[in-house]
């Protein structure tokens, strides 16, 4: 069997944890399996690199930031390979250039295009554990790029797909996927399994266990995912196409406090205006989520939407640059908000799910500012100060602890 194992920064934060990961991988290796390990930067090292960069230049070029960021993962993989050597197991560390991990040229948020697996396969044939840098790639100009938030998850899934691995195991500081963040909802329960679609929505909406791009890729290529803890040997949660047990009405509740709302006031109420608005944002690679259009005054309309907090400055700058083309009157932004979502394939065949969610929020005195729905998701925008209380109320309303 070929197993890809990805470990995040907290899992390799110090010597003790590095050896904990190494011993776990050696156990797999000694079963006769091929092992590829994908690592993030150690602990909070990426934050340290950001601080160092901003001390030199408060607006550092994105290309140079990508070059700097690659140091973190390269440190992790080289130290891990040294740990394997100390344990008497042959291993080799490889960075994105050595693996030939080809990406687009969008610095800070590149997309993987293809992976040349020849080097990895050659090392596996030589009975080595292969330790690969997550989060990074190389563009057509041979410049380093980074894959953005959750990039190491994406690297692991992409490698698993390219190598036709038997499984891709994502190790975190929690032991699986829960019905809610157990740090915010003490009654949260671990799920044995969840569908790709449910996990994708939860990941997109704030559940930090897996990144949405990695789930998209796993679904596209049919990569079996397992989310497990790096600190214990519990079974974890399997993410797959279909669950084998009866679908739950609701699989989970997610809270995203990183979102911000932007309101574009006084747009002309004519065909194509929404397209023009979101097209200028798309060209800057800014993702929008919850969207609300309302009637303005005297032949105008207002459009509100949410973006990730890190994209706020770019979004505002882009809209201001295009004010003449868009013809809006005012621009407002709001930070102290939260997106609260419920996700579950079971809601497709059960009416009244949204009403039950709204009732639980009403009973808690939580005001809803915006609403967005899909077949398996309901999302509301609320005040950030109400977020955790609302999350627990909704979790209780759907009896997710049982």
Label the model's feature ranges.
Residues 39-46, 227-244, 299-300, 305:
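Terminal amphipathic helices with adjacent charged low-complexity linkers/tails
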Residues 238-402:
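A conserved regulatory-domain signal marking ACT and ACT-like small-molecule sensing domains
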Residues 218:
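Acidic-aromatic/histidine active-site loop/patch
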Residues 167-171, 225-227, 289:
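Short hydrophobic alpha-helical runs that function as membrane-insertion/retention elements
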Residues 1-215, 382-383:
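Nucleotide/pyrophosphate-binding catalytic subdomain
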Residues 33, 89, 223, 286, ...:
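Short phosphate-binding/catalytic loops that engage adenosine nucleotides
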Residues 210, 221, 232-237, 312-313:
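Surface-exposed amphipathic alpha-helical tracts and adjacent flexible/coil segments at the periphery
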């Amino acid at each position: 069997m070929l197993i890809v194992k990805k470990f995040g920064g907290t899992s390799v934060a110090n010597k003790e944890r590095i050896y904990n990961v190494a011993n776990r991988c050696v156990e797999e290796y000694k079963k006769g399996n091929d092992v590829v390990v994908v690592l993030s930067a150690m602990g909070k090292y990426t934050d340290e690199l950001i601080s160092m960069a901003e001390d030199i230049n408060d607006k550092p070029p994105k290309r140079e930031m990508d070059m700097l960021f690659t140091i973190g993962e390269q440190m992790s993989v080289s130290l891990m390979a040294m740990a394997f050597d100390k344990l008497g197991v042959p291993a080799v560390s490889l960075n994105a250039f050595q693996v030939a991990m080809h990406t687009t040229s969008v610095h800070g948020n590149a997309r993987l295009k293809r992976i040349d697996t020849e080097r990895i396969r050659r090392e596996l044939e030589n009975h080595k554990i292969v330790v690969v840098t997550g989060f990074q790639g190389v563009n057509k100009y041979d410049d380093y790029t980074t894959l953005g938030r959750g990039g190491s998850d994406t690297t692991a899934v992409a490698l698993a797909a390219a190598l036709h691995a038997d499984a891709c195991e994502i190790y975190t500081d929690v032991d699986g996927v829960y019905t809610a963040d157990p740090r915010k909802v003490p009654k949260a329960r671990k799920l044995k399994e969840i569908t790709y679609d449910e996990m994708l929505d939860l990941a997109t909406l704030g559940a930090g266990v897996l990144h949405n791009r990695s789930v998209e890729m796993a679904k596209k290529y049919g990569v079996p995912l397992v989310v497990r803890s790096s600190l214990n040997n519990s079974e974890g949660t399997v993410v797959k196409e279909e669950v084998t047990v009866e679908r739950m009405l609701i699989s989970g509740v997610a809270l995203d406090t990183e979102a911000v709302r932007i309101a574009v006031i006084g747009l002309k109420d004519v065909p194509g205006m929404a397209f023009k608005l979101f097209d200028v944002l798309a060209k800057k690679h800014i993702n929008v989520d919850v969207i609300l259009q309302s009637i303005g005054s005297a032949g105008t309309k207002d459009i509100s939407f949410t973006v990730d907090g890190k994209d706020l400055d770019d979004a505002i700058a882009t809209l201001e640059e295009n004010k003449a083309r868009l013809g809006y009157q005012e621009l407002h932004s709001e930070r102290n908000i939260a997106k609260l979502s419920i996700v579950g394939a079971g809601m497709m065949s059960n009416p009244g799910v949204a009403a039950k969610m709204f009732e639980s929020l009403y009973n808690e005195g939580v005001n809803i500012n915006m609403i967005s729905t899909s077949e398996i998701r309901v999302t509301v925008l609320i005040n950030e100060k109400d977020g955790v209380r609302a999350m627990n109320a909704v979790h209780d309303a759907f009896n997710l602890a049982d």
